[in-house]
Amino acid sequence: MKNTRLFMFAACTLFLAACGRQTVKIMTPPDASNRVLFGAEQLQTTLDKAGYQVMMQQGDTTFSDPEIKTILLTEVNDTTLKKEGFHISTTGNLTRVSGRDGSGVIYGCRELIDRVNDSDGKLNFPEELKDGPEMVLRGACVGLQKMTYLPGHGVYEYPYTPESFPWFYDKEQWIKYLDMLVANRMNSLYLWNGHPFASLVKLEDYPFALEVDEETFKMNEEMFSFLTEEADKRGIFVIQMFYNIILSKPFAEHYGLKTQDRNRPITPLIADYTRKSIAAFIEKYPNVGLLVCLGEAMCTVEDDVEWFTKTIIPGVKDGLQALGRTDEPPLLLRAHDTDCKLVMDAALPLYKNLYTMHKYNGESLTTYEPRGPWSKIHTDLSSLGSIHISNVHILANLEPFRWGSPDFVQKAVTAMHNVHGANALHLYPQASYWDWPYTADKLPNNERKFQLDRDWIWYQTWGRYAWNCHRDRTDEMGYWDHQLGKFYGTSDENASNIRVAYEESGEIAPKLLRRFGITEGNRQTLLLGMFMSQLVNPYKYTIYPGFYESCGPEGEKLIEYVEKEWKKQPHVGEMPLDIVAQVIEHGDKAVAAIDKAAGSVSSNKDEFARLQNDMHCYREFAYAFNLKVKAAKLVLDYQWGKEIKNLEEAIPLMEQSLEHYRKLVELTDEHYLYANSMQTAQRRIPIGGDDGKNKTWKELLVHYEKELENFKANLALLKEKQNGNAVTETVEIAAWTPANVKLISNYPTVKVDEGISLFMDVPGKIEAVAPELKGMKALRFNGNEQREKGTSITFETDAPVKLLVAYFKDDQKKYAKAPKLEIDASANDYGQAEPVLTNAVRINGMPLANVHAYSFPAGKHTLMLPKGYLQVLGFTAAETKVRNAGLAGDEETMDWLFY
């Protein structure tokens, strides 16, 4: 058969040579690996498209015809080359591509392919070139997750089915994706899912745990085999990610358990199920790695250590033992929601081949100058000596506009090496992670745009600099000008304007979030804007700890800046007013550059028009934000100086900001389906995104217009009060009425009031309490039991109620941790994410407490609360108006002006 193919190739060669096509011969050894053959195939395809007649010769590698351009592909045991490295040498008509391994041959072929493509088909091969990657792992992820919850399921719970993920079963789409990874010299593919095992393996002891039907299960087996085989021949390592502790829904229902509960203890049943799931997966898919997230459904570091060392690692070892393997495949551990170094210290004696992963700038892209406590996590992990992976995660602040700044990416990857000590890259999609494979672009006839088509420059920039970030800036500008010129059908000189637009616009979202954001996480969608209340009193919205200290250069929040101005104190670092001035300059330059390029674009014109529109969107957003910040500065000036004119001068700035925001609405309304792809209750800033609401600029405009109306009305009242014309009313705050519930848990109760004790073994008594809480029927607890076991409450109610839980404002381990969406995606499942009363309870000898309300429908419920001291102040059906109860003192804030 092989001889027949060679004869046919030869015959075709003679025929086409007569037609004037230059012949190129590609030779591979008789024992060539699948990766070498794949490299040859890719090279053949490129040369064929460039107009060459390609002869493929496997077996005899003798250079016998000096008149024919010949390329010889071989693997060599050359220790001067890095793993995946290659050596290209050209003498006369013979070009040798020698790879340290099969992947090295592939990347050597890609080098030749790039040179052919970048030179209009010329065979300008290097006389001598050695190259290899700087980062050991260079990969991208795909989420088997969706924008909203599946009915009856919790966060991250998405079985692998054609109904939920039709694209997962599309082999052509996977081939395109894998080829994209190869083209960008990436060698790893991560699949993210909450609990994939119940879609991919069957367990003899728990046959009912399978979450998909038999037909789907067989499809999943076939797809996983296909995917891993296709990935392997491209030198790509497939890695399956999973969260802990999540159970399959049928397994949980069989035993009367929840699929996930952050605050429940580890039990033998849950551990056994998970260990056997992992063992079965390792045995069935031996070439697939595992990425372990010890969260978000586990609470304490002690549990994390126990779970990783006594369940996960033993499960991996069980699977290896069943295969008779003695090696240790890589096991990757995320630092998210755990003390990764502590876990690693406990795990390394048990399992050596451990990798670590931590988010680069949290869940956004904010800086190429990372620092602070989050950088220390990186350096602590990279100092362990294992491979440490920098995770460019979610990109919440870049959704949904196009982003692709080569300069920013090169500097960011350099920081990964030099600041964090990372030697591997994990890359999320640029936007719309939760809507993969589609973008947020609105197209005619309800068509959808694919991320791979739109965001090609995102993958190409990160892939290029993960391979080598030490490239000359001038050379790089020329490289990207040429790439953009090819894509848009214009000259390199004109394409430089497109690159400038990308690089100027690429600074806007990072700078604004790091100086004004509440969080870098999914909780905030920056490009929808922010409310004035969030700018003048950000602390009310719970700034994520470590964010400002880690995700940008040293600098000041607006509220800090104004305070220092009034106190005549020296400023430090990046200033908020400088940043908003810079972003409008970036916006102006981006628009000027992209508009200048528009006239000569001849290819991908529709995509260019959308890119051009995005640049205009960025500019309008920057102007709207700039004016709003200036208005917020005046409001904060009033807080210190009590000059009404400051508030009056804020109004025209807010009005001008709205004018730019209305232009943004016009630019986005027919171009985008949404801003944020996570469309659940986890989205809180600028406003709650429950049930897919408040996801467009048109929806937000109504809220921002109302904000201005409220401000004008409150300013008028303030003026009347100042002029002595207002009637002063004394507002008496009524106590909330306790609700009637059947408390099944056996806890004693007590009426809330000053002087009573809420703990049976802690001496402190209530010194002060918010009036809303007086008379509530609180539960009394043994504090030591709370610290050891957590708090579990079972009750039954005939009507909807709210359970009031008070968390102490202290990060000591003995106090239970308040809900935090950045590390616990279930932290708003009961509407409990934000406190309804802040500074509401003061107990002698303990910190102040904030009160959170957990909402429940009628029925029987069990709520597990975290380990540590907390108070359960009872049940109510009353409307719980959010306010600061003020027990910390009369701290005046200005956010009330906007309500």
Segments predicted by a language model, with ranges:
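Contiguous ligand/interfacial binding patches
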Residues: 816-883
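Glycan-recognition and processing domains
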Residues: 727-787, 890-899
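Short, well-ordered secondary-structure micro-motifs within conserved domains or adaptor modules
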Residues: 55-82
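C-terminal motif of bacterial Sec signal peptides marking the signal peptidase cleavage site
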Residues: 17-18
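Catalytic-core regions of glycoside hydrolase
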Residues: 187, 221, 226, 232, ...
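Extracellular and analogous surface-interaction loops
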Residues: 783-785, 790-802, 852-861
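C-terminal non-catalytic alpha-helical accessory regions
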Residues: 154, 429, 450-693, 711-725
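Feature activates predominantly on carbohydrate-active enzymes
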Residues: 23-25, 31, 39-42, 46, ...
